[in-house]
Amino acid sequence: MNWLIDSFKRFDKKIAIIDNNKKYTYKDLLDKIEEYLDCLKDKVKRGEVVAILGDYSFENIALLLALYLNKNIIVPITSTKESEIKERLQEANCDKKLKVDNEKLIIENLNCKTKHQLIKNLQNKNNSGLILFSSGSTGKPKAMIHNFDNLVDYYKGKKEKNINMLVFLMFDHIGGLNTLLNILSIGATAIIPKNRNADEVCKIIQEYKIRVLPSSPTFLNLILMSKSHKKYDLSSLRMILSLYLQYQFHLCQMFVKI
């Protein structure tokens, strides 16, 4: 049995995810994962490269974990531009494209004939994988492949905590997925914002007493410029997590002073 699934069974009625103001327990999440695993039977083979279209949602998180258990190579794609989606599907050598529409799982065959050697290596080891794309700010976005089993197992044995954490970074961002895995491994609650504007995020921080904010210097600047921090009580915040704050330490100091 998988250690993460064992943890979900133990967490049981604790709130795992709040999506669109609706609360889902760890039992709800486990039930949805099992539902998707049943849907994948005979339709998605182990080791196939599978894209998930869409951003964070209760359903997409359950689908991500179902594909992880099915030992697939997973490609989260949050873009809504058809040309960009098509390019990423081709670049990642995707076999299937999955989308949840009105709670119904839609599976589309892409029949990719070629596979990169790094994908073959994961398939030969019977490991799940994760393919993410660079931002493309300095040119064409580059595909990066990760061993998803290793990413998940990094969080094994973490101490259980009762805290609310905001899932801010995108579904196709390594920082966002690390945040999600950390939350679920410790039995905490992941709160998905309706959108990522400064007002909405500050409102959530106040409402759910958020203590940890995964963010970026750009977004912290937006909060300061919009003065959303003056409309809401952000005193619950204890930590700001970012890959880039070491280069923006003065900004972090300014934010702490508000």
Protein language model annotation of sequence segments:
Residues 152-164, 172-212, 226:
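Conserved AMP-binding/adenylation subdomain of ANL enzymes
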Residues 193-258:
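Conserved adenylate-forming
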Residues 5, 13-44, 83-86:
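Conserved AMP-binding/adenylate-forming core of the ANL superfamily
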